[in-house]
């Protein structure tokens, strides 16, 4: 399992194209918050911490599926002394490592918005960040099933449509409900409910992906 995890992490961060994508995304986001007053405000905080970085954490599988399809690695790894459940589990563990890394990177931005831009207080920022963390895990669970089921090309289309849908939902929430009202919502209730949902969805996601993978390679 460790070999597959390391292979996936290598493909995600050491292949030039993927590394450039990661660096470009992070540098662009950092630069945008530095030069744009809008992005330094509460809207930018919500967009980055609750939506953008949590969703970026689940992109490792897309990168590895793309490489695996090119090299037909799915067939090769079936010859390893690993069960199909261990192969699928290794994909999830590698993805969760990246998800955890993006969670920490997102927390750095929380500190920047609190102590640098002084956009939000730490008391309000931490629960909001928590919602982003849990929301990212929920998106992770859904997107991993999508990539195991659809493959790389259709999976990319799914990711694009999902991102468009999430951005539209974010904008509608902000402008229909109001930014102040959203920030004042009792976030502990959201986090508690979403934690349970995330845990359940992650378990369901793993077993669905395992079933899909087993059916494809039976």
Where are these regions (language model features)?
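Short helix-to-coil transition segments within interhelical loops
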Residues: 78-84
